[in-house]
Amino acid sequence: VWYPALVPEDEVKLGQYTAVTRNPGITATLFGRAIRDAIPNTAAGSFPLIVISHGYPGNRYLMSHLGENLASKGFVTVSIDHTDSTYDDQQAFASTLYNRPLDQRFVIERMAELGKDQSHFLGGLVDAEKTGVVGYSMGGYGLINNLGAGFSDKAVNATVAPPNDLLAIHAASNPRFRDSLDPRIAAGFAVAPWGMLQTFWQSEAFAGIRTPTFYLVGDKDDTVGYETGVRVMYKAAYNSERYLLTYKNAGHNAGAPMPVPREILDSPTGEGADHYMDPVWDNVRMNNVMAHFATAHFNAYLKGDATMFDYLHVRRDEPAAAVGAVAAP
């Protein structure tokens, strides 16, 4: 969890994280700007909540660069370690398919409870009524479902799906599907969301999304697909204000993963490095561009800052961005 805090002016100590990497045999030391156990800044009132949801596999540190950044902009950010879906606990894919939407909703509810608990350090700090979710890959899969796009019946019966039609609770054909959605999710940021290329949705399902959503993807992403994947999702979500940012020539690692840990680069085999790196783009550059647009998106839709729309309405092929598209009507 990252949050706005009161930091003494003479405080120069930077935060450190000890994190398991994509090669579970290697543990990395990550350096950030957050200070552990800092005094929460409650004088400014409560802050909108942002939930960060990683891919399969991943962990809560993969997008720590974004968690820290958004907290510095006046948000409480929480990054999930998804059970059965982390580097050192990668279990059957079916568990992730079933649990990812549920995990995200559980964390929103738990953070809301902690925000109301005055004995907890988050007491009075969290405004869960204004929640944003960042989902990368399988995190994006869960996010898109939680925004209102129910899965197809083909997904429920897929060979990779959990048994006994468990996915039916997340399906568009379930008459109670929309009742399970959390109305506190007021903005989504979907990074290379998985599932369209794998027919887990029918295109008409995205009409069920009415929440402002920012889509980010590389146009060479062969994991989730571009023209037949994320662009289809973006175009079909016509009932929502939405944006699409494309990293030209980038693959599935566009934007979200932190730079490859030095411990992996220094290892004899370098195993796991390709989990973080893109063949074309520099990680820090991708992270910074993503943070720029995430800041604008969440400030606009969670805080009501209309000046942020100038940063979202970029022209196509501007040198400062990749490809930007304005919101749909």
Give the positions of each predicted feature.
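Active-site-adjacent alpha-helix of alpha/beta-hydrolase-fold enzymes
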Residues: 207-286
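Domain-level recognition of soluble alpha/beta enzyme cores
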Residues: 2-50, 227, 263, 276
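Mobile cap/lid helix-loop segments that gate and shape the active-site cleft of serine hydrolases
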Residues: 20-33, 148-205, 211-225
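Short amphipathic alpha-helix adjacent to the substrate-entry channel of hydrolases
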Residues: 32-52, 57-81
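Catalytic active-site module of serine/aspartate enzymes centered on a nucleophile-bearing elbow/loop
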Residues: 261-329
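Active-site machinery of serine-nucleophile hydrolases
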Residues: 4-7, 61-88, 94, 101-102, ...
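Gly/Ala-rich beta-loop-alpha elbow adjacent to hydrolase catalytic centers
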Residues: 135-139, 143
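Alpha/beta-hydrolase active-site loop
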Residues: 62-72, 92-129, 142-148, 154-174
